[in-house]
């Protein structure tokens, strides 16, 4: 363990010394990925006013398309109600979950071949496993507290 700690400290010291020996400009340039073939670096004394006049100027109006821009709202209208794919069962319906899961498991024959069909099939398997786990948990809790249903809150 001590060997790894010494190795880690030596590695840290080597990288910090290497970064101290480099000029700061080189460190800055290394941290930014650049394409040198697309860039021409000129100093201030090399650029003349003739070169600037030969450059085509690109204004903001040239960059904007002249086509009509249509912006659609991502908000729902008030008359649209979101629909739940799987409604949340109420406490009274927890007892009949086995029959409900069998009713919702009816799929078309070719539905399992599509991605949506596979997703629906996996969702039904997860729901079935969750229902079984919930039923087993409730039975276990009832066995731990057999008289819990008889307890009434004091008023």
From Swiss-Prot:
Annotated Polar residues bias: 90-101
Signal peptide positions on this chain: 1-18
Residues bearing PTM Phosphoserine: 48, 53, 57, 59, 65
Keyword field contains Ribonucleoprotein: no
Domain of life of the organism encoding this protein: Eukaryota
One Pfam family of this chain: GLYCAM-1
Transmembrane segments: none
Sugar attachment sites: 34
InterPro entries the UniProt entry points to: GLYCAM-1
Family designation: Belongs to the PP3/GlyCAM-1 family.
UniProt-recorded name of the protein: Glycosylation-dependent cell adhesion molecule 1
Species: Camelus dromedarius (Dromedary)
């Amino acid at each position: 363990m001590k060997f790894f700690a010494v190795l880690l400290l030596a590695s840290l010291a080597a990288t910090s010394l290497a970064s101290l020996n480099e000029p700061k400009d080189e460190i800055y340039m290394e941290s930014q990925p650049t394409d040198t073939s697309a860039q021409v670096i000129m100093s201030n004394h090399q650029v003349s006013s003739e070169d600037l006049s030969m450059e085509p100027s690109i204004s903001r109006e040239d960059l904007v398309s002249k086509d009509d821009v249509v912006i659609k709202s991502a908000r729902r209208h008030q008359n649209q109600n979101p629909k739940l794919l799987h409604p949340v069962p109420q406490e009274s319906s927890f007892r009949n979950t086995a029959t409900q899961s069998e009713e919702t498991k009816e799929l078309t024959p070719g539905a399992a071949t599509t991605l949506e069909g596979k997703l629906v099939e996996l969702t039904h398997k997860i729901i079935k496993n969750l229902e079984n786990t919930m039923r087993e948990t409730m039975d276990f809790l009832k066995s731990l507290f057999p008289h819990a249903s008889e307890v009434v809150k004091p008023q």
